[in-house]
Amino acid sequence: MLSWVLLAWAVACSALAGASRLTPSVLPLVVRNPYLSTWLADARHEPWSSWPIFWTGQHMGMSIMAHVPSTGNTYPLLGRPHDSLGPNNPNNGCFLGSKYDASTTNMTYLIQPEGKHLAGESVKITITFLSPITPTSTLRQSIPAGYVTIRVEGNMNVNIYMDMNGEWVTGDRGSSLIWKMDNIVDTGKGESLYQWQVSRKTEQLFTEFQDRAEWGMLHFLAPQGVRYESGTSMLLRTRFARTGVLQNRNDERFRTVMDEEPVFAYSKAFNLNGTDDEPNIEAIHDEVTFTIAHTQDPVVQFASARGLTLMKPLWESYFPDVKSLLNFHYFDLDKARILAHRYSNQLARDAQLSAAEDYVDVVALTARQVLGATSFSGTSDNPLLFLKEISSNGNCQTVDVIFPSFPFFLYTNPRWLAYLLEPLIEHMLSGQYPNNYSMHDLGAHFPNMTGHPDGKDEYMPVEECGNMLIMGLSIVNSLRFPPEANTTAPWYPGTLEARDAEPDVVGLFPLRDLQTVGGIDRLDSVWGVGPDATNLARKWVEKSYRLWRQWTGYLVEFSLEPHNQLSTDDFAGWLALQTNLALKGIVGINAMSEMSRFVGKTDDYKYFKNISDTYITKWEGFGFSRDGTHAKLSYDWYGSWTTLYNMFADALLCFHLDGTEYDTHPRTLDDQEPIAPPPGKTGFIPRRVYEKQSKWYANVRQKYGLPLDSRHLYTKSDWEFFSMAVSSPSVRSEILQSYAKWVNETSTDHPLTDLYKTEEDGGYPGPNFFARPVVGGHFAFLALEKACNGKATDGLKFLDDKDNNSPEDIPEDNVHDGDADNEDSQSPIQDSDGSEVKAGDQAQFPIQDMDDSQMTIVNEND
């Protein structure tokens, strides 16, 4: 039976516990790029229950402990350093919970030792991991470093210890390391910093081992006033547990990662108790900040227009050397906090208005994961952003990975989306890719962006052409917003002053002329202001118009009836006549018609517009079930159904506003009047398609969300949010609740997966995806709220107005004459293991088309 003291202690822990609403299994700690990516494993348990992990799930050596001098007790806070202390150190504090926003993860603890002589003494410790997302400062976003701040509050003295090991610079535990302690002196401030520098003895450029970089250097910084030491992990931790201090010395016996595991440590003493003569009764607070950086030069190799190029990090355009960078970063903490908090706060406000409280946590969890797949490079004249296809195969700059992530970039900073597309456009304009459709990726494995001169990249021609055209027009539209629309955008720096590129600048979107606003320096100039921005958008389209037109020509020939090929959901296999894929291609053609009109190519505009209008009518007849209730997976697969997540692009690009009262889309050339829409035509994709799909999603929703299609019970979370964004508010709310339930209950044990089971334990269906940037699709609601001068969601209000249960007829001459034209030849619905889902199973799907039977959906988990 618990003593009253222990019972009170347990109640105190419970009463003080505070956490974010959603409880994922893993939380971000230091996440900046594909190689600086450390996460809290088992995040539903105490942070000392396991080691932090790399995004692959492998352990990362980082630990934090607290030592209380008055009792001699040592408490693990993060990682498992107590494994080094033996069984005689069972002390655990009270973990009060984790909280997170877009840039920050906080973990809070309470230490309150037992004993009458310690009555009333306690200390609260908060560890804050800050990987600041700064949409108004691309320079800061490009810095490969994060902050760790440990704040103590109370009236009891406490010593804090933190260490790291060589797993931060190699994935091979047999690698030989070198390290040193160094000082960085800030002559302006008169302050200096300690710096542990750790690297492989022999670096291997552009090489990975288990997805970790085998080149680059770890920098672990601390302020003056701390103590430091390197040496064998067990010895350092044991000595700290006994004495509470480190020895200010360096173990110079270089060795491999796990040969008497060398660690690099700091300790800090906090005197919160005062003195014996004047003890502190009231709680006081203090803190210490460490920074963790991983620098590489070069960062990738890229087959640019001038040939294979070793690409430097973007930060080198602003700092003469690494020490200058690290010094700036450390002392920039206050400004970085302000900018990161501005973004997090606005994101929370916008998410709350767009959906619900759960959505606030969803996008907060997503943000660092998206940017954790990217690496800023290029120069201030021509910045570039490179992306790794995390976990699925490691491809570079994969177009159909950028596409699902692009709502995040449109909402957060469209400039970064332009930087993502630029390497692809430059490479293909240079003639290094032989096919007449868009390439799938820039290289088989990051960081080697060597292209595919043989044209044998993964075959997704309709997919990638449609993706590039849709994203291209979205960038153009972001530049055509009026100034008042941009003042509410996350990338708005606080002034509408626009700064033009100088004539000798290579790129159209440089970062050469940074500005100071409100006492914060090194901010970007505003994106998308007035006629200058419109002219910039026009130049951007014209520069690569040949490619846009070439890709559209391919879609004209092949998108209406796509032959057997892959879509972005390549794990589902090859399939001909995919309804959703065809829709992407047709929307892409319509996007090209708009870009042609924008740059004054009248003949191209008329041609592509006529084609897209003709195709969309035929597509509806081909792609919908004969009773007109839902889209089929493919034109000739009767009894099937699919999510139409590519319909999101129709709304995002404002095509759904055509002919409506909300049609504020810039639609005229300088020298001609707009072409009137056909009588009675509202929108590009008919409204009835939106309405039917929204109703269908409500019918087929499962315990953990909306399945991708009728083949399996798995889903893709990015496409769920694309689909939700263009559904009725009630359907959106229901699916969002299912997704939030999944976040809280899933058995997955890595950073957020985008591919999961909607039933059972919500686990991986195989393949196992995790930490991928495609979760940027979770920002679909927010990107849509900002689109079309803020009118995009107004144009979807028709989804609220009625509940039309009578499907409109589809002209018979538009029904596709496929191979499987017998309505009775239906394919069974399959679970993720390939087995048929039968009547009476926990989650039933319709196994017949609605023409033949009345469908009943049973979901026992609702």
From Swiss-Prot:
Its main location: secreted. Residues 853-862 have a biased composition (Polar residues). Residues 1-19 form the signal peptide. It is found in: Secreted. Glycans are attached at residues 106, 273, 436, 448, 486, 610, 744. It is an enzyme of class 3 (hydrolase). Glutaminase catalyzes the hydrolysis of glutamine to glutamic acid and plays a key role in nitrogen metabolism. This is Probable glutaminase ARB_05535/05536. It comes from Arthroderma benhamiae (strain ATCC MYA-4681 / CBS 112371) (Trichophyton mentagrophytes).
